[in-house]
Amino acid sequence: MPNPNVGMMYPVFAPLVSHTDGSMPTYGAGVVIQEARNATVSKTYNENPLYGDDRIVDDDNGMTALNISFEPTGLSDSDRVLLFGETLKGNVGGITAQVEMDNETPYGGFGYVRKMRDHGTYSYEAWITLKVKFTEESQTTATKEQNISWNVPTLNGRAAALDIDGSGKLSWRIHYSFTSASAAKTWLNTMLNVSTATT
C-alpha cells in the first residue's frame, strides 16, 4: 500500500527562464517561500471512450490539466515580486511602494518535500511542478478577538506541461524519494537553482 503522507516542508519557487523541447527547463535563482502548511494537487483527465459492439473497446484518458492550491504561512514582499510580478513604484505618498499591477504573472518551477511514514520508517519525497504560475485570488483580514485567527494566504496555481526528454510525451511533474529530508532539500536546491546561502 502507498505510504501515508504525514508532513510537508521546504516550498521552493524558481522563475522559468527558458525551455527547449527535449530538455529540462532553465530556472533563475530560486527561493524558499516561508513555511509550508499544505498543498493540494488536482488533475483533470480526458474521458473519450471508443464504443464498438455495444461496449467500450478503447478509451483516451490522458491528463489535460493540473492545478495546485498552496498555503504557506505567509508571503514576504520579495516573495510577492517573484510569484506575482508585483513591482516597486517610487514616490507614492513620498515612499517607494509595492504595487499590484496588471502584470503578467510569471511562470516558474515549484517544489516541496512530502514526509512519508511506513510502519515507523520515514521517507521524503521531493516533488517539482516544472512550469506553473500562481495567483492570490483572495485575501482575508480580520480583527483580533479572544483567540487569534491565523489568516494565511492561499495561492492557486495552473501548470503547463513540457517535453523534457524528446519523447514527444508531455511531463507535468517530477519526483524522487529520499531517506532523509536533507537529501530531498539538496535535490530541490540543485533542480530549482536555490543557493544554500538563502536557505
Predicted regions mapped to residue ranges:
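Short helix-loop boundary/capping segments
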Residues: M101-E137
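Polar/acidic, low-complexity leader/linker segments enriched in S/T/G and N/D
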Residues: M1-T40, T198-T199
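Exposed beta-sheet edge/beta-hairpin loop segments within beta-rich domains
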Residues: N61, A97-N103, D118-G120, T141-N151
